[in-house]
């Protein structure tokens, strides 16, 4: 099943609890953050998984680390930050259709922003099938330099980079600033995954095939575009196609894209990248993404290998 190494942000997602009153508003904390979600999703699917990141020496940092360790994720490369630096909190609001919005509460700097190049070691990346990261750590240093260090080491070790863009426009000074920082990492990536709402601001098109062609022209080998309820699109230099979604009752879409990517990467760890294999990777990705939407929290409904097999086979 290979080894997936994910690095970047990890946060505590905060959801409203049950039975609020006029004088009490209960909340439930759940671990989150795209790279951490990918690591957990990969581990549940039977892959070896490691996470490189930074959390506070606080209640939420302890909670997140314990959750990752219970899932079988190697956390030996996670930095702990002393106060006043804290683990970031993301308050999640869920709409009626399962979509969500986030309000972040962070110290300045936040623990996840202090991931540094020194935290990214050759030993952690050695033997990996894929190295995965997104764009949020690229917003500022030292986390930005840590991502570049990971990409550099991955190149030296011949480990493919899987870049899940995960673009959050409100976190950047401008779209242009994001494009300038993201571009060099795209050029170092073998796989790039985006959602359909990210291709327009970053690539200037709303067409998935056109966006994929632009990325392939920059040296990317494989592009995935997740299309929400429409499924997913995939493309290489030789072929392209799409797979349908799996209908489910959506409770919370948080982590669906991370589940998609993890399932695809785990499957691609085992086989040559011919058209049949890539199509199956996309199909399994859409299935994992659908299952991830059926419970609250980014990690709550991430499927095991057996659960994914039963679901895709109609069981």
List each language-model region with its residue ranges.
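General beta-strand structural signal in soluble alpha/beta enzymes
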Residues: 6-7, 77, 161-163, 193-194, ...
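Conserved phosphate-binding/catalytic region of the ribokinase-like
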Residues: 1-5, 152-153, 204-315
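Conserved N-terminal subdomain of the carbohydrate kinase-like
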Residues: 48-133, 310-315
């Amino acid at each position: 099943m290979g080894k997936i190494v994910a690095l970047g942000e990890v946060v505590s997602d905060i959801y409203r609890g049950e039975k609020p009153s006029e004088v009490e508003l209960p909340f439930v904390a759940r671990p989150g953050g795209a790279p951490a979600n990918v690591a957990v999703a990969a581990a549940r699917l039977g892959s070896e998984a490691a996470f490189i990141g930074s959390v506070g020496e606080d209640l939420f940092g302890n909670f997140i680390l314990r959750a990752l360790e219970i899932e079988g994720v190697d956390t030996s490369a996670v930095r702990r930050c002393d106060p006043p630096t804290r683990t970031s909190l993301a308050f999640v609001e869920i709409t009626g259709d399962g979509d969500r919005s986030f309000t972040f509460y962070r110290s300045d700097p936040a623990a996840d922003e202090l991931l540094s190049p020194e935290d990214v070691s050759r030993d952690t990346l050695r033997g990996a099938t894929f190295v995965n990261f997104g764009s949020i750590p690229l917003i500022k240093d030292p986390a930005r330099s840590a991502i570049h260090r990971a990409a550099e080491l991955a190149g030296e070790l011949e480990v493919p980079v899987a870049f899940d863009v995960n673009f959050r426009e409100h976190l950047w000074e401008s779209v242009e600033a994001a494009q300038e920082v993201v571009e060099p990492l795209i050029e170092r990536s073998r796989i790039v995954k985006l959602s359909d709402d990210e291709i327009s601001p970053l690539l200037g098109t709303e067409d998935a095939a056109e966006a994929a062609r632009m990325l392939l022209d920059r040296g990317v080998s494989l592009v995935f575009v997740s299309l929400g309820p429409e499924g997913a699109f995939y493309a290489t230099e030789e072929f392209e196609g799409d797979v349908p979604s799996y209908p489910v009752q959506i409770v919370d879409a948080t982590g669906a894209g991370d589940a998609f990517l993890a399932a695809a990467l785990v499957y691609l760890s085992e086989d040559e990248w011919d058209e049949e294999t890539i199509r199956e990777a996309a199909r399994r990705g859409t299935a994992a993404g659908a299952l991830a939407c059926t419970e609250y929290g980014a990690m709550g409904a991430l499927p095991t290998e057996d659960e994914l097999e039963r679901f895709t086979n109609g069981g």
